[in-house]
Amino acid sequence: MFLELKAQATSILKEAIRKAGFEVEDSELQFETSPHADLASRAAFRLAGIHRQNPKDLASRIVSAVEIPEGSFIGKVSAAGPYINFFAGKHYLNGTVNAVLKEKEKFGCGAPKDRILLEHTSANPNGPLHVGHIRNSIIGDTLARILRRAGYDVEVQYYVNDMGRQIAVVSWACERFELDLSRKSDSAIADVYIKANVELDKNPGYIKEIDALMEKVEAGDVRTIEHFDKAVSLAVAGIKETLLRLNVAHDKFVSESTFLKSGAVHDIVERIKATGRTKTDKGALVVDLSDYGFEKTLVIQRSNGTSLYTTRDLAYHEWKAGQADRIIDVFGADHKLISGQLRATLNAIGVKEPEVVIFEFVSLPEGSMSTRRGQFISADDLFDRVTGAAFEQVETRRPETSYEFKKQVAEAVGLGAVRYDIVRVSPEKSTVFNWKEALDFEKQGAPYIQYSHARACSILEKAKEEAAWNPDKEIDPSLLVEDSEIDLIKKMAMFDSVIDLGARELKPHVLAIYARELADAFNQFYRFVPVIAAEDENVRAARLALVDCARVVLANSLDTLGIIAPESM
């Protein structure tokens, strides 16, 4: 709704500027939100600079030329010094309520757009995911959900490293040490992987065996490939379980080895050579990207002729470029250099480059993590801690409920807290995940937003019992005139613009912030305005419809954040 409000304001302002004797492009209208209006334009500043006139006088001149069409979302336009302020009218407010009631879960969805292939998580299958990995998963999954709601056709992929050095170590470890298959499969893999690294540190001579395994895989040795596949399958099966619990889904798992077997890796190396950028450095084949601003060369082939992860990743990206209109990668900050080199190399051979979302790292108060050293808290362990603490809270708040209810709510609240607390921070900022704070209702995180949704559900259930409320009965939104009612309607109307912003800038945290603000607006409304207790029947019906609208938009926001919206807590 807000996007349409802005579009109408743009049209009205552009026409008024034309009538005032000036010309301006849409991009020069410079709209912004303001505490003094629903939209404010700085166009008078722009025009004053060009025509050497007083911006305050120009703003008044433009406003005097404004004509608001019948039925417009704009109710009033005024000048405030050099600013041109736009105020939403009754058609906008009433239209928002009616749109939410009609569209329900479709409210905030954009028109169909391009096809996007988005890759995220893609952690090495050498053990369980830890909290560092799941920031990638949460950012990527939330972005996919935002993009889908914005109208994009999104396919999400996980790129499986099934043949790199770490996987060679995993395969070697599985042959050397016994797997404890009574444990979750990715944890069993981590156990032997950690043991193998201890062994390799003590006896560096074994590294030759690792190198030999990698050469055999590249040469297509069937038995070695089978051992690699078995180890990788076990790890990936466990990783999928973890992601499923976090409400993260991938449409496709793509194996790195696919591109070696198909000949795509060989082909892309030959095409890179043809650019004249390659040279030999200590027997290895490297790419000179100095004209792209990279002093460090990119190694694409080892001295023994085997390919690297990066080489295979280049082939993967070329394949992806043919699958979609846009390619998006979600990488940690440690991939900043390599992702830049990858983009430059693809550009050099005429392949569509990916858009890259780089995120800084998340840590726990306990410190840093490393799968190789065995110094990590798995995502599974973290989830168990958080949901366990959430269960205790539910038991305290709702002792009369069943064990199944408590367990279900604890899982929704605990995992919601993890997702929200991680995604609420802008990707480029590092963060420390403190699960106790994430579960604190006073911190206004996921539990607070979920509770606001449950509260709306509870009000509506009570209304059906006590006030004979009929949700299908037509209501009059124009009866919603209190400040807190109007504030809530305007906040709901912002949903489509928040989705649009998150999709355009690939910033999922804007939706997390919005969801909290929406919960605030709903709770303020309910605090100051009687709903079921409203004396006038028509006003009561309108306010209950507004509660229903808030429930819908809170649910849509939580769903797009990948968080369960409980009906009762």
UniProtKB/Swiss-Prot annotation:
CDD domains referenced in this protein's UniProt entry, alphabetically: Anticodon_Ia_Arg (cd07956), ArgRS_core (cd00671)
SUPFAM superfamilies from the UniProt entry: Anticodon-binding domain of a subclass of class I aminoacyl-tRNA synthetases, Arginyl-tRNA synthetase (ArgRS), N-terminal 'additional' domain, Nucleotidylyl transferase
Catalytic activity: tRNA(Arg) + L-arginine + ATP = L-arginyl-tRNA(Arg) + AMP + diphosphate
Placement of sequence motif 'HIGH' region: 123-133
One GO location term (cellular component): cytoplasm
Biological process per Gene Ontology, one example term: arginyl-tRNA aminoacylation
EC numbers: 6.1.1.19
Molecular function per GO: arginine-tRNA ligase activity; ATP binding
Protein location: Cytoplasm
Principal localisation: cytoplasm
Protein name per UniProt: Arginine--tRNA ligase
Signal peptide (residue range): none
Species name: Methanosarcina mazei (strain ATCC BAA-159 / DSM 3647 / Goe1 / Go1 / JCM 11833 / OCM 88)
Keyword tags: Aminoacyl-tRNA synthetase, ATP-binding, Cytoplasm, Ligase, Nucleotide-binding, Protein biosynthesis
Family: Belongs to the class-I aminoacyl-tRNA synthetase family.
